[in-house]
Amino acid sequence: MNLCHVGQNGDYIMNEMFCFQCQQTAHNTGCEGKTGVCGKKADTANYQDELIGALIGLARAAENGNPTEKTDELVLKGLFTTITNVNFNNETIKKLKTEIEKEKGRINSEHFEDYDMTNIWDAHEDVRSLKSLVLFGIKGMAAYAYHSLVLGKTDREVTDFFYKALRLIGEDASPDALLELVMETGKVNFKCMAMLDAANTDAYGDPVPTTVPLTIEKGPFIVVSGHDLHDMKLLLEQTKGKGINIYTHSEMLPAHGYPKLKEYPHLKGNFGTGWQNQQSEFHNIPAPILFTTNCIMPVRQSYCDRVFTTSIVSYPELVHIGDDKDFTPVIEKAIECGGYDEDKEMTGMNGGHIVTTGFAHNAVLSNAEKIVKLVKEGKIKHFFLIGGCDGASPSRSYYTDFAKMTPPDTIILTLACGKYRINDLDLGDIEGIPRILDCGQCNDAYSAVKIALALADAFGCGVNDLPLTLVLSWYEQKAVCILLSLLYLGIKNIYLGPTIPAFVSPGVLNVLVEKFGLTPVDTPEHDLSAIMSAKS
């Protein structure tokens, strides 16, 4: 699987790859050969595997060693680096691995070998599946923990679990023990999402419902993609009074809902649609794009001189903004490019001209009494959560079609970049409650769960007894940790698509179906009929 050979100088010459961590993996079995579907080259994939192997060695060294905050940060950076569409740069991956090797020796005088990841890829399919669920889950969780760390919040239980999970991934373990670890991953990730929610709201206030235009005003502007609200705040501050407008892209859209970010009048609107459309939407764009996290795709010639990276994101030959967060090169490029000569009208994926965001748990639950009343009066019959990661697969039109088919007496919660499939639809409202409520970024699945738990409490029932159905889309590893949290919380009958993950073996899938009622999506008509019949 993870094939390579050693050259005369002792360096690995990486000829072939094996990677199946994202939804678009080739043939829904795994990317092999020289390039993955995401654009990642074989050598990059293998360097990332080596990086994970080094982290497992570091976790072993930390068990009876003396890890510090620096060690903790390296673990988060290492895991985050290997998330899909974060890092395509071999040099930064190798540099990070070298740092990890040095840290291993610093915290423990004993020698700890790096783990060979082919031990996982070549294991029994159920063991491989369960270890993959944990590994990909902690990759996603590391992103949330890193964003929290940047804002000054950490949690010892969360941090310690990364070490525990890495060590157990590198050990022989029974399927039962690994299934228990899978559930623990979901438990700890829920705590991690709560930590990030607190970090974001402490820093920027509780999100408020906000209408966001999709028109790009004439003049210089910067497009900001990714999830890092801290980077957004710093850029807004550095561009204040310079005549440069700021537009969100993809998962940065929820920034518009935070009061402390809304204070900046040059935070104008949202550029484009889902991340998967960036290569066409950024074609000849007269402005720079700043990637703060995933998803960056292979950068095309028509805009490569305008793309900047920061934080964990890295791509060969692009300008990277370092830890000093001096965005001067981005600002200068915006002035140089000049923006559009006239206002440019853009639309959402369904032709809409505005979207809304800011319906996090605080905003929605402030209307809980009204929502409960509407349910009791029969004016709201059902709630759907339609969201998750978006992607390029044509089958993802399922989510748009499903939303369009939902009855007018139902409410749709949405979140993450999967929202772009539906967030510009005009589905009206129910006595002032919009039928589409955008809860935020992928980590704001925490908000959706808090809303569900509060409604269950108000009705005196369990979450699974609510008129609520989760219809989720997945793409990368943050979706994995969210799914594991939902399973840990005992939320059942989740519809998952557009495909079942390649790393979920038939045996493990059978457990998820039997124990949790996990259901692969079929057609919108079939699934909606089944849902409404079951809840009636």
List the model feature ranges, each with a label.
Residues M1-I13:
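Short, Lys/Arg-enriched N-terminal segments with co-localized hydrophobic residues
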Residues Q8-D11, M141, P209, H230:
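Intrinsically disordered, low-complexity, compositionally biased regions/tails
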Residues N15-T44, Q48-D49, I56-G57, E180-S536:
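Anaerobic metallocofactor- and corrinoid-dependent redox/one-carbon enzyme cores
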Residues H5, K94-E99, K153-Y163, N464-L470, ...:
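Short alpha-helical "patches" and their helix-cap loops
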Residues I52-A203:
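Electropositive, gly/pro-rich neighborhoods at or near active sites that engage anionic ligands
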